[in-house]
Amino acid sequence: LRVGGLGPSDDEAVGPLSQEGESLTTLGERLGFAPTDWVRLQRIHGDAFLPWLHRVARAPKDLRLRLLGGNDIAYTKLARRWWRPIAATRVGHAMQHRPVYFVSSNLHAIPNLLSGYVQRRRQLLSDFLARHEAAPDGPTGDEVQALRSLEPHANPENSLYYASRLWHQAHREQSLRDVRRAEEAERGITQIDASTGFDVGAQVIELAALHGSDLDPRLAPYAHILAASDAIILNVDYPLGLASYHIVREVMTSCDDVRGVYAIGKAATLNAAIGDVLLSSEVFDEHSGNRYAFPNAFRAKDVSKFLTIASALDNQTAVTVRGTFLQNQASLGRYYGERFTVVEMEAGPILSAVYEATRPDRHPSGERIVFRDVPMDFGIIHYASDTPYSQARTLGSRGLSVEGIDATYAAALAVLERILLTERSRISGERGEEEHAP
């Protein structure tokens, strides 16, 4: 297999082309790379990019993949190994019998909203932005400029969170990451690094250990709920495909009282714009062939109140694909013709796991399944990262950068507000039962 059309005859070309940056751009064009993908490849390899190109050019390549443990039992074992370090934490021991809210999301938005880590460094981050704004040619100059141009229209807290991301990119010392983890741990947020083949990290968040004064201002009205709650949030780092099915299934098996299952993720949109929020009430799952209809816990009004730039679209219909690389204009056109508007990679398998947690049998294949009464709160929120009809690129490969902060934090806020409101109702109900007990 000749990678990108680069063969032995091109080895000589890499040498002179590497002498100046604009010649590297020419090489990317000759190899058929889109400019953004070529820059992305350079960033991945860093200083090793040119030596890597020389190695690629030296001889034709024969690439082979071997799938290890690709059966249901092996996946189940993998999910149990993934769960063990979570169960071994102090709070993890208690998760079996306490209320648990499962969230599939990234690992930065929810801690930022709950821990106060970023707010406590407001002046530091302001000074950081000012320095890099004065030096636009620096490594983060473009993103700082983009953030500054967005600030008049963005929520100031969201801008601060993005500034924190840029600051940590510029300061990668382990000691700084340790400080952040220590502060979060003091507030009941325990980080569990990915350690198995799933490569999925997690956070165990104990609501009662959070400090009400640290909450994002938009969550401040719910601060009084924290101390009275014994609930735990399990935030898991974007499990995709069948990994999401096996992880949700393992959580349901290990925890007796799962009160909510929520998924926040990127998706391709066939009818909206980059950064818009998409709320589906029906999902076709390519893995099982099932078409799931369900009452999504979130409507446009639940998310739009936290949006300042993007739009929220509900009543969408999603398709869970097996892999983003496999999608092309023909398949996307077929889906759009069947009135699908969202293309993503996790909702279908999660729904299959929810089916098995609420029905006496394993999920079927090729059927239409309607969830009318689910014994737990369930919601899915996507935000558009790709518009494949107008941009020919692998789905999910595009980093949202500044464009994504509005939707990312609106989705996270909607989920956290939902959890806190659910906890308020649960606690009030339990108190009412105690008052009326004989």
Residue ranges and their predicted role:
Residues 1-438:
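Accessory terminal and edge-of-domain segments that mediate assembly/interaction
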